[in-house]
């Protein structure tokens, strides 16, 4: 019998297999505003300085970050647990064949991760994926074996404080001698990890499961497995960013970070 975590993991896997086509069409080769305005600038700034570094792209989806990395000259090994997403990635990355290697691997499975090879990678990267994983402990435990001494793990996540599944976007009027419109975030859950179903794209066939964890969970898990924190950037949309919906993420929330990008380094 499946335990609750295994059940949620299997549900997540089924959701991403079902949603792969819709996700690939939406993200394409260029991604969305979350990727281009929030995540990628910080991720890119944290990458290794040597252009021939070997990077592990964790939960690569349709190959969005893989392509960017290959274009920068890096050697990239990428994987995802969705076979459907890997097929889309192969199609989009065909011309980068000499620079990229794609695999169907489950990031929650230590044995599958070790298949990639020990002391092989200068850097591991995960863009907006850790909160889609039912259990991230096997990944953090295995990365020190996959990375070279002093290697780095760079990851972006939705900001645990302000952009979690319990967050509500609020607009209010305030009068302090003049009428001001205030855009704010109201959140009711943070400290205790929990899971909740949601839609990343409104037309996706199957809801996915979000696994919400406080910031201390991610950092302490890294510290426990030999990493130190050496890069930290909270990312908010610029004020001029258009709103896709009246209360969606955009320039109206320019004082509230929607994403967080972290670099951790093995303490060699």
Language-model segments: which ranges?
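A short SAM/SAH-binding and catalytic strip from SAM-dependent methyltransferases
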Residues: 123-136
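A short glycine-rich, Lys/Arg-flanked "PGG" loop and its adjoining helix->strand segment in the class I
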Residues: 137-152
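SAM-dependent methyltransferase
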Residues: 155-220
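Conserved alpha-helix/loop element of class I SAM-dependent methyltransferases that forms part
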Residues: 33-52
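C-terminal lobe and adjacent flexible extensions of AdoMet/dcAdoMet transferase-like proteins
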Residues: 217-268
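Class I SAM-dependent methyltransferase SAM/SAH-binding core
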Residues: 54-58, 62-112
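A short acidic, Gly/Pro-enriched loop at the edge of an enzyme's catalytic core
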Residues: 113-123
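N-terminal, positively charged/glycine-rich alpha-helical extensions of SAM-dependent methyltransferases
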Residues: 1-24
């Amino acid at each position: 019998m499946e335990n609750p975590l295994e059940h949620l993991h299997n549900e997540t896997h089924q959701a991403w297999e079902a949603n792969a086509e819709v996700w690939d069409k939406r993200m394409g080769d260029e991604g969305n505003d979350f990727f281009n305005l929030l995540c990628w600038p910080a991720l890119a700034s944290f990458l290794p300085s040597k252009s021939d570094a070997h990077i592990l792209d964790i939960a690569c989806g349709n190959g969005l970050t893989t392509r960017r990395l290959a274009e920068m000259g890096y050697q990239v090994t990428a994987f995802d647990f969705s076979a459907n997403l890997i097929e889309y990635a192969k199609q989009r990355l065909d011309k980068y064949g000499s620079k990229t290697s794609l695999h169907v691997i489950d990031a929650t499975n230590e044995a599958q991760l070790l298949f990639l090879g020990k002391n092989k990678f200068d850097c591991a990267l995960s863009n907006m994926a850790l909160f889609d994983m039912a259990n991230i402990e096997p990944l953090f435990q295995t990365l020190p074996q996959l990375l070279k001494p002093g290697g780095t793990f760079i990851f972006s996540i939705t900001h645990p404080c302000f952009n979690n599944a319990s967050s509500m976007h609020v607009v209010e009027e305030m009068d302090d001698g003049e009428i001001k419109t205030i855009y704010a975030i109201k959140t009711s859950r943070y400290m205790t990890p929990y899971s909740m179903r949601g839609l990343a794209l409104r037309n996706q066939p199957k809801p996915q499961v979000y696994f919400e964890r406080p910031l201390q969970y991610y950092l302490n898990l890294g510290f426990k497995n030999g990493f130190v924190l050496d890069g930290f950037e909270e990312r908010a949309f610029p004020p001029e960013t258009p709103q896709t919906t009246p209360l969606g993420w955009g320039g109206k929330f320019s004082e509230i970070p929607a994403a967080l990008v972290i670099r951790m380094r093995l303490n060699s």
